[in-house]
Amino acid sequence: FLNEMDLPYKKVDPLPNTAITLKVEEELFDNYKLYELVRNKLWSSGVEVIKNKTTTKDDFKGYDVVVVATYAKLNDLLEDKKEYQFEVCEKPVVRLPREYQGKSIVIMDGPFMCLDPYGQRNHVLGNVVHAIHETNIGEEPIVSDELKQYLNKGVIEKPKHTNIDKFIKTGKRFFKDFDKLKHIGSMYTIRTVQKNREHDDARPTLVNHEGGNVYSLFSGKIDTCVDAANELIRRLQGD
């Protein structure tokens, strides 16, 4: 694939329990800095930002165009409700040995894991299996009371319900001194994907006209946000 796409890479000594390990150039972003950039861009553009408010359909009144981009809560605001697959996911934030600082590593392909820099010194972990605590298919997520208290509240320190031990057990197969990490805490959220797509893990970005002046945007990948915005503009100009 890398050869076909003419992407640079270098073979290095393979990590334990891997057939091949490749070093590649990959762009990452600092989520803290990105937050500041987006916030400043909104303010400088005269966009009114309203936080800590529950939006209802009554709030749609008085606008030329309404774009619903509420991810797991799309069905809360749309008349035509769709079924999705909802997954309560945990993203542990850890401090790894210094040799991992600034490095992003993905073990692929299959039920494996990844680690990515988070801020200046920490990493955030991902795992195809152990990141998911609960899952359901339907029009709205079903979340246990134990996990509901953690959702979308940033890094939860010393969470009672965590799979960090399973993350560590998996990571030890591939990463030296992985069990020496410090668990800073974990973030919890609801990942929303199309139902029954385990065979290809498809994560499409969908821009739909819901009728009248209402549009919806369904996407869970930050790297598609610009394409999604451009597609929305194209649809608005076409309609």
Where are the regions that the model predicts?
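Amphipathic alpha-helical segments that form well-ordered structural scaffolds
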Residues: 1, 37, 41, 166-174, ...
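General small-molecule cofactor/ligand-binding pocket signal
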Residues: 8-10, 48-50, 181-185
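Helical element adjacent to the flavin cofactor pocket in flavoenzyme catalytic cores
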Residues: 22-78, 225-235
